[in-house]
Amino acid sequence: MSGSAPSIPNLLTLRGRIGGGGVTRGRYRGVIHRGGRGHGPGAPSASAAHDATIQGTDTDAAVSRLSAVQIGYIDDPYAELFAQSGPGAARRLPIINRGTYARTTAIDKLVDKFLDDTESSPEGRQIVSLGAGTDTRSLRLFSPSAPTPRKRVIYHEIDFPAMCEKKQRIVCSAPQLRSILSDPDSVEELSQHGGGNSWHSKAVAEKHKGSELWVHGLDLRAIAASQQPQQPLPPGVPIGSRGLHASPFTPGSTTQHEEQTEETSLPQQREPLTLTSLNPNLPTLIISECCLCYLPPSTASSIVSFFTTTIQSSLSIVIYEPIKPDDAFGKMMVSNLAAREIRMPTLEVYKEAEDQERRLREAGFSGGEGKGIGGARSKTIEQIWEEWTSQEEKERVDALEGLDEVEEWKLLAGHYIVVWGWRGVGVDLEI
């Protein structure tokens, strides 16, 4: 994708400037937050091309992560394994590096809180990352040098089969990962749902005894379809052929697609969907970093519903998405999308922080009789920087490369949010 192609500005891969007196279009790179997880509706004829485009955006996300690592914002010794090398390839603008830092540390904070709360769970606990791509959180978590032992953590990642195969190839070929994960084993699952290239590995370090990584090659909309009434497939269309496609945060496009109803765009399933080793009786955390926002609201809700109905233990969720589409900056984002015939359907419904919190409460993250404690909270990236980052840490980050575009930072960071919810006894993500 050309660097001049119009797309939504993003806290990871922005390659331009926001005008000092107002918002200007600028020059932005195609964007995605992590991995090939942008999933929008598409016709079967365009499926393969769009899937390939989305999967390619993982490279850009990995380079953005590496930029923050190389400059010193975050510590991730595995980032370079997943980023293509080249002179100056990893350098991002300070405003983007700070966004990468704030988002990464915020989600890490919530993940750590969940794991701390569930440390005493006798059978373990599990994390499910939607559209994980080549994200390195599981590697950092299971690293021998990780600051905290994390025993009995079952970590699930779900993404396109090709993305899962790519990650397996890197894990198998990188000597430095041998101290983290055992040799991956192929997992035969989900063939009736269009899945493939699933694999499994175990954490090697004794301090993480009993922890495992399960990588599921699966079109996320198959999960949504499993929650929908079954409808017949059109003649000649194989199960799972309606893949997940490009999104506002990917350099893919949906120009070939006509508007479709949510019902006709969902992959239809012939058997109930199950994820190998997903234990309904374990405390569970779901992570969606700019994944669900590219789906129709009912599809995104069905994916969440799959987990709220499947998991019988305590359940938590962390979502990272853009908000505020109706102000000047938000309208520019939406306009950039429309120029490429791409929509973010959930952004049209969950426009503000209170909408995102209500979304989680309506999904069941509110406690109540028979459910124990629960709640839904949110912070913009700007609030996370101001409220969750210590003064000492702010000074350290400022010293790395400085930030001249303070107002630009506030504008951009105010349009991204981390929203999280929890339900059930034994987990409290009140921060």
Swiss-Prot record:
InterPro entries cross-referenced by the UniProt entry: LCMT1 (IPR016651), Ppm1/Ppm2/Tcmp (IPR007213), SAM-dependent_MTases_sf (IPR029063)
Family the entry assigns: Belongs to the methyltransferase superfamily. LCMT family.
GO biological process, one term: methylation
Region annotation Disordered: where it falls in the sequence: 228-268
Function (record text): Methylates the carboxyl group of the C-terminal leucine residue of protein phosphatase 2A catalytic subunits to form alpha-leucine ester residues.
Keyword field contains Transferase: yes
SUPFAM superfamilies the record matches: S-adenosyl-L-methionine-dependent methyltransferases
Pfam name, any one: LCM
UniProt binding sites for S-adenosyl-L-methionine: R103, G131, D159, D219, L220, E289
Name used for this protein in its record: Leucine carboxyl methyltransferase 1
Annotated EC: 2.1.1.233
UniProt keywords, alphabetically: Methyltransferase, S-adenosyl-L-methionine, Transferase
Entry GO MF terms: protein C-terminal leucine carboxyl O-methyltransferase activity
Catalytic activity: [phosphatase 2A protein]-C-terminal L-leucine + S-adenosyl-L-methionine = [phosphatase 2A protein]-C-terminal L-leucine methyl ester + S-adenosyl-L-homocysteine
